[in-house]
Amino acid sequence: LRASIWIAATFKSKMGLQQSMPLDPQVKKLFSLMAVFPQPDIGKITPQQYREAADKASIQLSGEPEAIGGIEDKTIQGRNGGIRIRIYRPLNQRPPHKVVIYYHGGGFVFGSIETHDNVNRLLANLSGRAVVSVNYRLAPENKFPAAVEDAFDAAKWVVSNGESIGLDSNKVVVAGDSAGGNLATVVNIMASENFIERQVLFYPSTHMLDNSPSIHEYGEGFFLTMDQMRWFGQQYLRDVRDAVNPYASPMLADLSGLSPALVVTAEYDPLRDQGEIYAHRLRASGVKATLTRFGGVIHGFISFYRYIYAGRDAIAMAAGFIKQ
């Protein structure tokens, strides 16, 4: 499979994707804002210290919260205990609301409902759907498959109980960014009951052993680094055997029968190639998949839509796809 990744990436100019653009000036401005935050050294601090620093920076850079129709925090029951969720209801829409279930990014190590509050507010308003944000368990305290179990259990809970809280949840959309994109598509793979209408994957992690060109091209100096990716994998996986489990590396799964997908990638992102190759694997498996690369931007750009306007455009694109 690794060889096929290299081959597919070599021919990406034929995929109909946007050709190379200079780094967006708005990204450069964001980098200058990020410079005021101490950069955690993964070799010298604990995962918990890394999480605290990364979450704090994410929240402070998210900007003023978007007005929303309503917010409700709940703790639901999963197979291994309580799972915290937050329900965002869109402005000017009466219940019952159709549903997007959202899984935040953060390398399976950091991130939370709070770090992605801005994204979920905007997605709810633009899509006209309720967004249910899931606070799944994080590594290394809870290694694979804990996050997967929480992600799936939360989706099942919403489908089974949504009507009681004003949600039209017979069919749901799953969405997520980075590690959350991994969880969204894995939930789709697991959902034999076919309750998933569509999947939205922002720069998803799809292969734990990926060695494609973009990892080396953009693995240093563009926000997400190769060293961080390796470290995240070490925190998340129990051992190397987990790396080839299709629930950790959905690139290795049977993708036939999955729901239509929107895959959004960022040009200056080490995860770019694996996201794009995953979209083509979906198509080769008979799944309708829309692939869009945003030029000139970095991993995580939707979280910084206050500074990088392409982030808002990507969320608006997702909202349009959800409403189709």
Show which residues each predicted segment covers.
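A glycine/proline-hinged amphipathic helix-loop "lid/cap" segment
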Residues: L1-I87
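Proline/glycine-enriched tight loop/beta-turn segments at coil->beta junctions
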Residues: G81-I83, P90-V99, S256-L258
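Short amphipathic alpha-helix adjacent to the substrate-entry channel of hydrolases
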Residues: E114-V134
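Gly/Ser-rich "nucleophile elbow"/oxyanion-hole loop immediately N-terminal to the catalytic nucleophile
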Residues: V159-V173
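Gly/Ala-rich beta-loop-alpha elbow adjacent to hydrolase catalytic centers
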Residues: G176, G180, A184
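Hydrolase active-site cap/lid region
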Residues: I189-R241
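Short beta-strand/loop motif that positions the catalytic acidic residue
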Residues: V263-T265
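Catalytic active-site module of serine/aspartate enzymes centered on a nucleophile-bearing elbow/loop
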Residues: R306-Q324
